[in-house]
Regions:
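Zinc-dependent deaminase
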Residues: 1-43, 59, 108-172
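Small-residue (primarily alanine) positions within well-ordered alpha-helices
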Residues: 33, 37-40, 50, 61, ...
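Short, basic and Ser/Thr-rich N-terminal targeting/leader segments
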Residues: 44-48, 95
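Short beta-strand scaffold segments in enzyme catalytic cores
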Residues: 48-57
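Short beta->alpha transition motifs characteristic of CBS
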Residues: 60-67
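Residues that line or immediately flank small-molecule/substrate-binding pockets and catalytic motifs
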Residues: 67, 101, 125
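A short, polar/charged loop-to-alpha-helix boundary motif
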Residues: 69-80
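Immediate flanking context of iron-sulfur cluster ligation sites
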Residues: 91-103
Length: 172
């Protein structure tokens, strides 16, 4: 398995890393996402949390993994946060919004982000097995898509990875 820790300072090759700016602008939302992830773990769900914010950093919605609780394979933190944001804003188009999430989104979540027309996604930990924002595939920046997102990766990576590692260690 590939270790993405500190590779390219958290970014894919060729992209500038703006850690100080990310930490200041997106850190508070990532802290909320990490709290949601910890709550998921406490409730027996894979620890993933997500927060949708607007350009001013105002929190629009939050979500956590609820697949087991709802018996719904689509109840990922990202999907639930996007649904809630759409309801709150009264639109399915979330232009100008950013999704902040503790784990690189999968293909399903990446597709939902494209359909929501988000401005960017900020995630903590890479998901080398199923990630669709740069590791396994890169659906959100595919030039063939009608919309593309900015991707910022690696913010609070160690904290997110620790939550995941602790969760799975308890189940082995």
């Amino acid at each position: 398995m590939h270790n993405y820790e500190n590779e390219g300072a958290g970014q894919l090759p060729g992209e500038p890393f703006t850690c100080a700016i990310q930490a200041e602008k997106y850190g508070p939302a990532m802290d909320l996402a990490l709290h949601q992830a910890a709550l998921s773990a406490h409730l027996g769900e894979v620890p993933v949390g997500a927060v949708v914010i607007n350009d001013d950093g105002e929190v629009i919605s939050q979500g956590r993994n609820r697949r087991e609780e709802l018996n719904d394979p689509t109840a990922h933190a990202e999907i639930l946060a996007l649904r809630s944001a759409g309801v709150k804003l009264g639109t399915s188009h979330l232009e100008g919004c950013t999704l902040v999430v503790t784990l690189e989104p999968c293909a399903m979540c990446a597709g939902a982000m494209l359909l929501a027309r988000l401005k960017r996604v900020v995630f903590a930990a890479w998901e080398p097995k199923t990630g669709a924002c740069g590791s396994q595939r890169d659906l959100v920046r595919d030039v063939r898509a009608t919309h593309r997102l900015e991707v910022l990766a690696g913010l609070r990576q160690r904290q997110a990875q620790a939550l995941l590692e602790d969760f799975f260690a308890q189940r082995r």
